[in-house]
Amino acid sequence: MNKFSEKDWKIFRSKIAGWQEAYMDKLNKEYIEILSGDGKPSEKFWTLEKRIKEDKKDCGVQCEMSRSNQFYFMISLLNEGAIFMDDLEDFSDDLKEIMQHFAGL
């Protein structure tokens, strides 16, 4: 699905790195909580290892940039909590409506 304008694509490209950095900062804080929690060091290690393995698949961590996948990346970012509808204020109304509909917001 590629219904978005060239302007929306340029905005997306300009924002994705910042969104990913903010999302990874949030994840790092959650990892610190895991490591600081109660339990055996080995349990915390393996819990964290499993979590990182899952998290690194998120678009908020990494995604291969392509305009044809912009829709899917943005839906994933919304569903992961890497971005919120407020983060889309610079985008076209059409894009915001589509995101709101498909993200179930």
List where the protein language model places each region:
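Acidic, Ser/Pro/Thr-rich low-complexity regulatory regions
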Residues: M1-L105
